[in-house]
Amino acid sequence: MRKHLGGCWLAIVCILLFSQLCSVKARGIKHRIKWNRKVLPSTSQVTEARTAEIRPGAFIKQGRKLDIDFGVEGNRYYEANYWQFPDGIHYNGCSKANVTKEKFITSCINATQAANQEELSREKQDNKLYQRVLWQLIRELCSTKHCDFWLERGAGLRVTLDQPMMLCLLVFIWFIVK
């Protein structure tokens, strides 16, 4: 019985150490040498145009096709024209500590609507279908965003973030068993 408990403790310690080592990124000598690297712009060099590009609610268009169900007709239209649609939204509304998921999604949609008025009101031949697919895409993109503090409300320990607490818990249990 004593050897079995020792093996369990050894397995737990190995798992904790392995999870710690997996989160550490290895960096070799190549990363220390800064050959041909561009100098990052200072805050004084950031122009209004660059700031306008990353305003809250701005679309991110990289030409990726997303896996979202728009209905039969909408899916066909999206398959043919996915490159015209955004595949992300610049939005970080997590500054308020008490924001709920519903409020976050609503404010994300409102910010996106305000930031992209010309594209949302653009006249196209297939305007109704384009608008329907675009609005469903915006709702879906806003609903997939999340705030880190929502995770903290859940129960349980996260091994990667609570490792000191796990170590203290292991030491405490070890003293109780001993």
Swiss-Prot record:
Annotated spans, Globular: 51-154
Residues cleaved off as propeptide: 155-178
Sites carrying sugar chains: N98, N110
Expressing tissues: Strongly expressed in testis. Detected at low levels in ovary, spleen, kidney and mammary gland.
UniProt-listed InterPro entries: Doppel, Prion/Doppel_b-ribbon_dom_sf, Prion/Doppel_prot_b-ribbon_dom
The keyword ATP-binding appears for this protein: no
Entry GO CC: external side of plasma membrane
Record's subcellular location: Cell membrane
GO-annotated biological processes: acrosome reaction; intracellular copper ion homeostasis; protein homooligomerization
Position of the signal peptide: 1-25
Modification after translation: N-glycosylated. O-glycosylated.
Region (Cu(2+) binding): 124-141
Lipid-acceptor residues (GPI-anchor amidated glycine): G154
Disulphide bridges, residue numbers: C94-C147, C108-C142
Function of the molecule: Required for normal acrosome reaction and for normal male fertility. Can bind Cu(2+).
Entry's free-text remark on domains: A short helical region is required and sufficient for Cu(2+) binding.
Protein name: Prion-like protein doppel
Organism encoding this protein: Bos taurus (Bovine)
Lineage: Eukaryota, Metazoa, Chordata, Craniata, Vertebrata
